[in-house]
């Protein structure tokens, strides 16, 4: 049985989020949540909430044992980039890029 969850338009850089996601790919759910709990990156908190949502989805689908779940697939796609401008000297402006990410996770039984 598989359960999935998706986080869309998260205000996180896809490149930095992939570093966090790579730490939990293929691990058991309890192990993955422990790793994320002690990770200093800001994206770890959102990925942890996403994993908990996927576990809740698995329970709703009738998973017999939640402790047997593991992270089968997890990946980060780049979302749209919000472009802003900040004023600079002599009437110029500089771009500020605010990237977004889409994170998808699939849990499966061992």
Swiss-Prot record:
Transmembrane segments: none annotated. It comes from the Bacteria. Signal peptide: none annotated. InterPro entries: Ribosomal_uL22, Ribosomal_uL22_bac/chlpt-type, Ribosomal_uL22_bac/org-type, Ribosomal_uL22_CS, Ribosomal_uL22_sf. CDD domains: Ribosomal_L22. GO terms for biological process: translation. The keyword RNA-binding applies. One of its GO terms (molecular function) is structural constituent of ribosome. Keywords: Ribonucleoprotein, Ribosomal protein, RNA-binding, rRNA-binding. PROSITE patterns: RIBOSOMAL_L22. SUPFAM superfamilies: Ribosomal protein L22 (SSF54843). One of its GO terms (cellular component) is cytosolic large ribosomal subunit. Part of the 50S ribosomal subunit. Belongs to the universal ribosomal protein uL22 family. This protein binds specifically to 23S rRNA; its binding is stimulated by other ribosomal proteins, e.g. L4, L17, and L20. It is important during the early stages of 50S assembly. It makes multiple contacts with different domains of the 23S rRNA in the assembled 50S subunit and ribosome. The globular domain of the protein is located near the polypeptide exit tunnel on the outside of the subunit, while an extended beta-hairpin is found that lines the wall of the exit tunnel in the center of the 70S ribosome. This is Large ribosomal subunit protein uL22. It comes from Geobacter metallireducens (strain ATCC 53774 / DSM 7210 / GS-15). The gene is rplV.
